[in-house]
Amino acid sequence: KMHKGIDFAAPSGTPIYAGGNGVIEFAGRNGGYGKYIRIRHNNQYKTAYAHLKGFKKGISKGVRVNQGDIIGYVGNTGMSTGPHLHYEIIYKNKQINPLTLKLPSGKILKGDELKRFKINYKLILANHLNNLFE
């Protein structure tokens, strides 16, 4: 089923990091999303993470998290066709396409950091493609 959000292929068990500072608004099973976490960042923005294998110990409703904290692990729960992270941005209680959201730019990778990123990206993509055909 087509949905708003973006899917990131990754091996089962890959850590998932909070996209920003906030408070866990929901952590549990959520229908077709399977194991699901929603973080409230402020009065307008939330992020959601679905199909998780599990939650990091201590993650539950009301817990404060910081950007970059591990919150859970990639899985294949709910209505999922393989291990991946389904990621959503919710603005004013409406799902929006994360790819079209205008946010301040992040760090630009250069040199060795960029090389490491490209290598890891290719490994994750290759692993996911192998899982599709097993």
For each feature predicted by the language model, list its residue ranges.
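C-terminal recognition in membrane/secretory proteostasis and scaffolding
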Residues: L123-E134
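Catalytic cores of peptidoglycan-degrading enzymes
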Residues: K1-N120
